[in-house]
């Protein structure tokens, strides 16, 4: 069995963003040479997320509104975590959107369902963060 590891780095200038990272993950898969196996894509920071969904701007807008209703940034005084930083809402948003995804690799390609894409979700931007891509298989 082969194993491949790569870190993707992001520095998002805005507080929140959704970035389609499918092409970057596909490039990792091609570089790995693995034809059959699994890909793990994992946000390596507690205020960022990796998830699978549709790449549709209206849906991304809906995610943003929904997350802000569930865990609003303001007022920052509502959170006990906000001592030194004002990012408690980002931790909660990450919990909702998830930490990682696993995708099957079949015949050298990501084995997605219809419309599925991999996204990096940023909830406390303006600092450098990484995503781990780990691929195992043959």
Where are these regions (language model features)?
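Active-site histidine-anchored catalytic micro-motif
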Residues: 1-138
């Amino acid at each position: 069995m082969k194993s491949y590891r790569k870190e993707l780095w992001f520095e998002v200038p805005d507080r929140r963003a959704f970035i389609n990272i499918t092409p970057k993950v596909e490039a990792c898969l091609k570089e790995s040479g693995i034809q059959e196996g699994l890909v793990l894509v994992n946000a390596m920071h507690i205020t960022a997320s990796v998830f699978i969904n549709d790449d549709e701007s209206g849906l991304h807008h809906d995610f943003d509104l929904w997350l802000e209703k569930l865990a609003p940034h303001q007022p920052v005084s509502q959170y006990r975590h906000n001592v030194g930083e004002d990012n408690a809402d980002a931790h909660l948003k990450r919990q909702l959107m998830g930490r990682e995804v696993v995708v099957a690799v079949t015949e050298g390609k990501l084995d997605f369902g219809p419309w599925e894409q991999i996204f990096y979700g940023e909830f406390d931007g303006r600092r450098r963060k990484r995503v781990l891509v780990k691929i195992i298989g043959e």
